[in-house]
Amino acid sequence: MADKNIVSRRSFIFCPGLRPDMFPKAVNSGTDIVCIELEDGIAPKDKDEARKLTLSLFNTVLDGKGAELIVRINSVRDEFGLADIRAILETSSPPPAIMLPKVKTPDEVKWVDELLSEREHKTRLHVIIETNAGLEAVYDIAKSSNRIDALFFGGVDMAAELRCKNAWEPLLYARSRVAHAAAGADLDVIDVPYLDLEDLSGMIRCLLYTSPSPRDS
């Protein structure tokens, strides 16, 4: 297994791309990762504005207060995701990492990697496994790019795809398969956002996962 720099990914906060004013609060929270959101929670009519506001944050030296900074783009299989990638390629100050949602094949990751390499962007990748096709191909996806730092398990969308309840037992196989693929590729693995804030002890009960993700800041 190759030696890697150890990066703490114990806690994770989403910050909406339309609200750059919330970014200082997020980075000052002490979290390990701040993810600026362009996908879920951003209405189609607001996608362009959210993209513009988010990428403008990286036009100057951005102080993340020690937090890892990630931008979750839209799926590269739709027009919004393609526009996100195009904007990242066009800027001379790309985000340090992007999160790829709803990945179905390793070719999607390879394509993004190749485009970033052509522009000599050093942007890292985080990949969400939340589709049945992605689950089937997860072992190949995990090894599709040296830019990948972590796999995320998207349990809510996965439950919808598998037509099962979003609960521990029905998703145990899917969650375990993602964990195994990540371990085999020497990647971190991060669980579905934890939503039951009244049961914090439940957040500890995670199977082979580096960390669960909390909700928005």
Where are these regions (language model features)?
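N- or domain-start disorder-to-order transition segments that initiate the globular core
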Residues: A2-K25
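Conserved, mostly hydrophobic/aromatic
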Residues: A26, E37, I98, I141, ...
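Glycine-enriched alpha-helix->loop->beta-strand junction motifs that scaffold or abut catalytic
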Residues: G30-D32, E90-P96, S145-A150
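Conserved small/polar residues in nucleotide/adenosyl-binding loops
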Residues: Y209-D216
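Active-site beta->alpha loop and helix N-cap motifs at the rims of alpha/beta catalytic domains
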Residues: R51-W111, G134
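Glycine-rich, proline-tolerant flexible connector loops at the mouths of alpha/beta enzymes
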Residues: C35-A50
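Hydrophobic faces of well-ordered beta-strands that scaffold small-molecule active sites
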Residues: S11-F14, V34-I36, L69-V71, I98-L100, ...
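Active-site glycine- and acidic-residue-rich loops that bind
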Residues: H126-D140, L162-E169, L197-G202
